[in-house]
Amino acid sequence: LDSVRERLLVAIDELPDDALLAPNTIGNWSVADLLVQQTAWESELVTGLKQVSEGQKPARLLAALANREEYGRLRYEENQGRDLDRIFDDLPQVRMQVEEWLEEFTEKQLSQKGLYPWLSGQSLAQLIARVTYEQELRTLPLVEAVVRKWQAPPDDLMISLTPKLGEDEATDSAN
């Protein structure tokens, strides 16, 4: 959990606010939108883990996983225009809640496949991985590409020290 999150935070550390908020940098979304999405998923996971600990099926989490695109669209609509300070406050707070809930389960409860019938043979740890670090790993290369693009100097600011083809002829004929 921690190493992937750290890679994500290191990647975006150098980005200014306008780069984080720039629309359409990753598909139709901004980097900030992706961070909000991750927080929303992990918040849903916290609710789901609470339900599991109470012996209940985490129906909303399972429905979200069954239709990730729709869940993402709804969370995007709910959180559009969210303040960056709030985003960066919520991201670690929700992750801490996930980690606290992990401590509530035994190793067997986390790792045994088939223990929870509604997971279709998966372990609880596999579900947690899908929602947390596996999701971050899928988006990390996209975020890193935005960072590289944002940090790269624009080509049009480069001044060529060698004449372009045809420039010699223009200066020669002017003499």
Which residue ranges define each predicted feature?
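A generic structural signal for well-ordered alpha-helical segments enriched in polar/charged residues
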Residues: 10, 14, 47, 93-100, ...
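Alpha-helical packing segments of well-folded alpha/beta enzyme cores
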Residues: 4-8, 41, 45, 83, ...
